[in-house]
Design a protein with these regions (language model features):
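Acidic, polar-rich low-complexity tracts and alpha-helical solenoid repeat scaffolds
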Residues: 2-5, 16-156
Length: 156
């Protein structure tokens, strides 16, 4: 009788203990490759150096674009988007020590440079992406201020 009771109790408790385990792992959007994060962080440091110290906005923009394309889940992507937006806007105004025509893109095996208006719209796009994707982010207010200075209407 006791053995039967213990067996019945064991059968009742066993499913409860299996229910305690996690079926899935962490959310895939939060998983980050450590090597990719390290590489992206290095590119961010170099972009900051170009941006703040050397006023080399073409080089800074290229580094930021590399991070955005290669690691969109980067932990500091907000700062990257702000720096890319500001670099683009300042290149459209011919600010900095590098000429805007040093920014070269290849499309269909053909080199092409961007006009001031293309740099401006690219900068606005980066800043709007920052504001829309990270509305409570640490760099959102700076992005809104940049857009306000350009008289760009707010999005809903």
């Amino acid at each position: 009788m006791r053995i039967g009771f213990l067996l019945l109790l064991l059968l009742c408790i066993a499913p409860v203990s299996y229910a305690q385990t996690v079926k899935t792992g962490p959310d895939p959007s939060t998983l980050r490759d450590p090597d990719l994060e390290r590489d992206s962080y290095h590119n961010l440091e170099v972009a900051r150096n170009y941006f703040k110290l050397k006023k080399a906005y073409v080089a800074s923009l290229k580094r930021c674009e590399e991070i955005i394309a290669g690691n969109p889940n980067f932990a500091k992507i907000e700062e990257v988007l702000l720096m890319a937006g500001q670099s683009s806007l300042w290149l459209s105004q011919n600010k900095g020590k590098q000429r805007p025509d040093q920014y070269v893109s290849f499309e269909g095996g053909e080199k092409r440079t961007l006009t001031s208006e293309q740099f401006r719209s690219m900068g606005i796009d980066y800043l709007k992406k920052l504001i829309n994707d990270y509305p409570n982010g640490t760099y959102t207010k700076q992005a809104q201020e940049e857009l306000r200075q350009l008289d760009v209407p707010k999005q809903p």
